[in-house]
Amino acid sequence: MSGCGPWLPHDLLWGMTPAQLPGDAPAWAHAVLEAGQPVVVRRALTAPGQVAVGLRGVSREQRYPALLDLQAVQRGVRPEQLCHVPPQGPWPALQALQHLRDELDAQEWIWGVSGSAGFELASGVAALHQHSDLDLILRTPELLPRARARELLALLDGAGCPVDMQLQVPGGALALREWAGPAARVLLKSASGARLVSDPWNPQEQAA
């Protein structure tokens, strides 16, 4: 994909240059852009013509928020485009992905790979290690029954590696693990912030 999107959280975008960084950006942020690495779309309100992104460095502490001009985007990759990219490493997160792939596909869900695994699969840049979790997203435009969420969580918990799945709903995202749990309200994250809701698919709660 290329052009002006629309881009969604967890999409990876290429085209940002060091010249687009603020003057106080750390040296490592300049280095990753000079190396041609992508940035990841994050949830935040922006002015028209911009998208909120995050840069990632070598260590977990190296994360930097920035704004990217949409016209600078050369191409982008969605998490669901990475489900069947052949893994190139021995890491448990990639082994878990191979274990889960067929079962998730069989449900005819729209799902994808995000986080460190998605970054490595999309860019070829080493981002995983022995103790990395596997981050997944699931597009859920309609209500996912909580009983079904519990079944899905049980599947993920049997993958042999910690798996963190986010449900992408029309008004934001929430953790599958929370929705599968007993709490009456769960944390819904949106571009305008986070709030506790009882029904993440209810537009009235999203706007409250």
From Swiss-Prot:
Keyword match Transferase: yes
A Pfam match: MdcG_N
Superkingdom assignment: Bacteria
Repeat as UniProt keyword: no
InterPro entries, per the entry: Holo-ACP_synthase, MdcG_C, MdcG_N
Cystine pairs: none
Main function: Transfers 2'-(5-triphosphoribosyl)-3'-dephosphocoenzyme-A to the apo-[acyl-carrier-protein] of the malonate decarboxylase to yield holo-[acyl-carrier-protein].
Family: Belongs to the MdcG family.
Swiss-Prot/TrEMBL catalytic activity: apo-[malonate decarboxylase ACP] + 2'-(5''-triphospho-alpha-D-ribosyl)-3'-dephospho-CoA = holo-[malonate decarboxylase ACP] + diphosphate
Signal peptide: none
Protein's recorded name: Phosphoribosyl-dephospho-CoA transferase
MF (Gene Ontology): nucleotidyltransferase activity
Keywords, ordered alphabetically: Nucleotidyltransferase, Transferase
EC nos: 2.7.7.66
Catalytic residues (UniProt): D133, D135
EC class name: transferase
